[in-house]
Swiss-Prot record:
It comes from Mus musculus (Mouse). Belongs to the IAP family. Its EC number is 2.3.2.27. Pfam families: BIR (PF00653), UBA_BIRC2-3 (PF21290), zf-C3HC4_3 (PF13920). Keywords: Apoptosis, Cytoplasm, Isopeptide bond, Metal-binding, Nucleus, Phosphoprotein, Repeat, S-nitrosylation, Transferase, Ubl conjugation, Ubl conjugation pathway, Wnt signaling pathway, Zinc, Zinc-finger. CDD domains: BIR, RING-HC_BIRC4_8, UBA_BIRC4_8. Expressed in small intestine crypts (at protein level). Expressed in bulge hair follicle stem cells, sebaceous glands and dermal papillae (at protein level). Zn(2+) binds at C299, C302, H319, C326. S-Nitrosylation down-regulates its E3 ubiquitin-protein ligase activity. It is an enzyme of class 2 (transferase). GO terms for cellular component: cytoplasm; nucleus. Multi-functional protein which regulates not only caspases and apoptosis, but also modulates inflammatory signaling and immunity, copper homeostasis, mitogenic kinase signaling, cell proliferation, as well as cell invasion and metastasis. Acts as a direct caspase inhibitor. Directly bind to the active site pocket of CASP3 and CASP7 and obstructs substrate entry. Inhibits apoptosis in intestinal crypt cells, its activity is mitigated via its interaction with SEPTIN4 isoform ARTS. Inactivates CASP9 by keeping it in a monomeric, inactive state. This is E3 ubiquitin-protein ligase XIAP.
């Protein structure tokens, strides 16, 4: 029996089922990656977690269950996403596996019948064989990592699912606490009664020792990124009034909260006396209608309200920032847009605090930046964390936003390295009086590939940053011809 491959895959004969059972364990799969290329854009651990084994050929990996094979990995690829596109019926990717007398779970992340999670709360129950696979696959694709879809009940504390109930829990909130009950309750947190410790009603995660610079949503998202509330998932909760509260689960229903405002024309009419600096047409297009009280607006679909608008704020971005689960927002802008807004906001918030130079704060900022997948990839390519952080800070200071793609970050890092090298060279070299013709000749030579001396330089080597060869000659070298550093990545550039 063979698997008919698509582009980026190969055909393999299905292996023996008993042999495959060895690789139900993620650890056993990871051991096959001992000789996996370190220069691969997707890490061995990510591929193993997605059910793959290393074949020993190039960057080709193969699923232990469906035996689909994938190669030619690129930066930004989702291991689980490509796995599911190539083999949508794979038992592993859908949360099931072969049955040997009893149901054997192969949900990614399960080992010895238990779930593994970075933010694990309490014990995990065995996977339920009759659970619809869509739940599992949806989370794998959206978060890129394993989350608990066992029989654990969500929300963890149904009594606190409404923001009103959470606010009431803060009656004895200590005076020394830096954050307000309103902000904490809005982020899904209620007071436990101990010190300044709060707990999420949904995932059960606990947070305490708040600092003045902390923001409730950011800390909740940073420490418990798989929380269903943080992800904006529908867990079928209702507020005390029987209707989803504004901040709980904006996407908990496919029906709009205010059908009368579902049309753009109906919403724009409500801005008749609008005096705020934010464009009313943009607000209406983003799903908001005016309440007639100052600059207060509300989304017709999720019911989320916003106020105190600043001139530079974009309605779509604020909608995504505060109400990421809104179905209207999701339909209009897509999940990738929402994810990018939250990633950018987290980085700007962290980097924007660098004016306060306390050791504990600096460490917290560094930890937040370091957890960014783009930063981890750049570090793996040989760039220093110090240079990455500096480049990201400069990006935010000059443009007001952070990086949304790894390629742009790498290009700026390479450019910064080149500028530093040129500055050092100009400081130490003697100024020579040379003719215009000689300068032109040298400039032309500098652009030529140092190997063939025929074509122009088109590749920069990472991590050394040297500009040495054309594209054709670069394919034939593994070490930089100038410094003999092992090349981990070859970045194409365009020289003017």
């Amino acid at each position: 029996m063979t698997f008919n491959s698509f582009e980026g895959t190969r055909t393999f004969v299905l292996a023996d089922t008993n042999k495959d059972e060895e690789f139900v364990e993620e650890f056993n799969r990871l051991k096959t990656f001992a000789n996996f290329p370190s220069s691969s854009p997707v890490s061995a651990s990510t591929l193993a977690r997605a059910g793959f084994l290393y074949t020993g050929e190039g960057d080709t990996v193969q699923c232990f269950s469906c035996h689909a094979a994938i190669d030619r990995w690129q930066y930004g690829d989702s291991a689980v996403g490509r796995h599911r596109r190539i083999s949508p019926n794979c038992r592993f990717i859908n949360g099931f596996y072969f049955e040997n007398g009893a149901a054997q779970s192969t949900n990614p992340g399960i080992q010895n019948g238990q779930y593994k999670s970075e933010n694990c709360v309490g014990n995990r129950n065995p996977f339920a064989p009759d659970r619809p696979p869509e739940t599992h696959a949806d989370y794998l694709l959206r978060t890129g990592q394993v989350v608990d879809i066992s029989d654990t009940i969500y929300p963890r504390n149904p009594a606190m699912c409404s923001e009103e109930a959470r606010l009431k829990s803060f009656q004895n909130w200590p005076d020394y606490a830096h954050l307000t009950p309103r902000e904490l309750a809005s982020a899904g947190l209620y007071y436990t009664g101990a010190d300044d410790q709060v707990q999420c009603f949904c995932c059960g995660g606990k947070l305490k020792n708040w600092e003045p610079c902390d923001r409730a949503w950011s800390e909740h998202r940073r420490h418990f990124p798989n929380c269903f509330f943080v992800l904006g998932r529908n867990v079928n909760v209702r507020s005390e009034s029987g209707v989803s509260s504004d901040r709980n689960f904006p996407n908990s229903t496919n029906s709009p909260r205010n059908p009368a405002m579902a049309e753009y024309e109906a919403r724009i009419v409500t801005f008749g006396t609008w005096t705020s600096s934010v464009n009313k047409e943009q607000l209406a297009r983003a799903g908001f209608y005016a309440l007639g009280e100052g600059d207060k607006v509300k989304c017709f679909h999720c019911g989320g309200g916003l106020t105190d608008w600043k001139p530079s704020e974009d309605p779509w971005e604020q909608h995504a920032k505060w109400y990421p689960g809104c179905k209207y927002l999701l339909d209009e802008k897509g999940q990738e847009y929402i994810n990018n807004i939250h990633l950018t906001h987290s980085l700007e918030e962290s980097l924007g605090r660098t004016a306060e130079k306390t050791p504990s704060l600096t460490k917290k900022i560094d930890d937040t930046i370091f957890q960014n997948p783009m930063v981890q990839e750049a570090i793996r390519m040989g760039f220093s964390f110090k240079d990455i952080k500096k480049t990201m800070e400069e990006k935010i200071q000059t443009s007001g936003s952070s990086y949304l793609s790894l390629e742009v970050l790498i290009a700026d890092l390479v450019s910064a390295q080149k500028d530093n090298t040129e500055d050092e060279s100009s400081q130490t070299s003697l100024q020579k009086d040379i003719s215009t013709e000689e300068q032109l000749r040298r400039l032309q030579e500098e652009k030529l590939c140092k190997i063939c001396m025929d074509r122009n330089i088109a590749i920069v080597f990472v991590p050394c940053g040297h500009l040495v060869t054309c594209k054709q000659c670069a394919e034939a070298v593994d070490k930089c011809p100038m410094c003999y550093t092992v090349i981990t990545f070859k970045q194409k550039i365009f020289m003017s």
